[in-house]
């Protein structure tokens, strides 16, 4: 018969070698599983729609949209990572040490690549708004694709060098049933700087510059300073500024969702608190495609086209879609 103390262990038959589990009422577990599973499914589904839309429709094959595709891929992966975190609701890991390491590595590579994609998108918008005449030559599809590949490669390389227990899965666990990354305190501080503080500074500086240019252009248009010859470029800048505003919303949501998780992890908060902010951290991946749905008519049009299975028709990739940068 299992005693109350043994009921709080992940592996009761191992006694003190087992990690302690978080005991919650059954109704709370059911509610959490339903909510978190729904978030996971929605995250995977919505980001899959973004991936299909940009990949399938050739009219959307622009440098900015390929950077957005990278962000959607990372958000899509987050939906699967979330499944592992649902398994950790009671603070117990019941899968093998190899799967634990896979989860840990993926949970660092994907958010790091997501942050890198956000930075690349910010740079893209900065060049498009602040240097529109040279944008077509500076930012090409090939350069965007190379940037995306380098972003993911550096994220993987960074993650492999970050973890101390990568070569010995489960060898440094304090108890059986634990699945946590092992990092030196100095490395944790360095990680916070490289994956949050530094990217946030770069993003904020770029968007402040974009905002200043947007305001100056608006004033110039209102005071009729713009020369007639520049009307064409001003029209282009309007669409670029619209894209910059939408991506500005993406960046703000990104910072609001990611900052609490990094602050709590650096301060070694309690597990329950950390789990809440970790969910907020992953919830950002669900919000991104929802932002596109609300702000971009072309995305809603693509979704209808995909869900009606019209993309299976011959020549559907050439379907006319309003070509806007995301």
Predicted features by range, described:
Residues 36, 53, 77-92, 104, ...:
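Helix-to-loop junction signature of class
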Residues 11-23, 92-108, 137-145, 152-204:
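Loop architecture of class A 7-transmembrane GPCRs
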Residues 22-37, 63-123, 128-138:
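Extracellular TM2-ECL1-early TM3 structural module of rhodopsin-like
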Residues 202-203, 253-266, 276-326:
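Seventh transmembrane helix
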Residues 20-34, 56-62, 66, 95-101, ...:
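Juxtamembrane loop-transmembrane helix junctions in multi-pass integral membrane proteins
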Residues 40, 70-79, 112, 147-159, ...:
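Alpha-helical transmembrane segments of multi-pass membrane proteins
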Residues 212-261:
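Intracellular effector-coupling site of seven-transmembrane GPCRs
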Residues 1-45:
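Extracellular N-terminal segment of 7TM GPCRs
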